[in-house]
């Protein structure tokens, strides 16, 4: 199960990033600036609908994503068959803690069978309450998830060191 993939996180505040020799990323986000970093790292992640799960009992939302590794340079010793650059994607897990509600907007009917392209995680204002926030996950084509949370507490962890891809995401502005 997805929930069994997570271990304990060392206590502390702020952004914590570690890279092991296999180049896998492990990051904890605790504030809005950290959330921006997580959003940048997850931009263009491909997520199967079946790989997202809200555990209301444990107040967490979990995702397994195939993220494009924007933070890594192209693979220097490798070209694709046309001589083009080769990039990397890594399988990663994302756990958003203290989630008390999930709201779907423009969500696909057959969402469990869908593959969604994550564009960004954004912090939205909390409507007239003394604590908490809303974290919005925006996907290509308009679907989004709004997670009501007690605080920003996100863990992102690569499961592997990455795999080559010759497809770099592009966006029309």
Model-derived features: positions:
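Extreme N-terminal basic, low-complexity initiation segments
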Residues: 2-8
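Short, well-structured hydrophobic secondary-structure segments
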Residues: 44-103
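Short, low-complexity cationic-aromatic patches
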Residues: 49-62, 125-140
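Short, surface-exposed beta-strand/loop "edge" segments at domain boundaries and coil↔beta transitions
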Residues: 69-76, 141-149
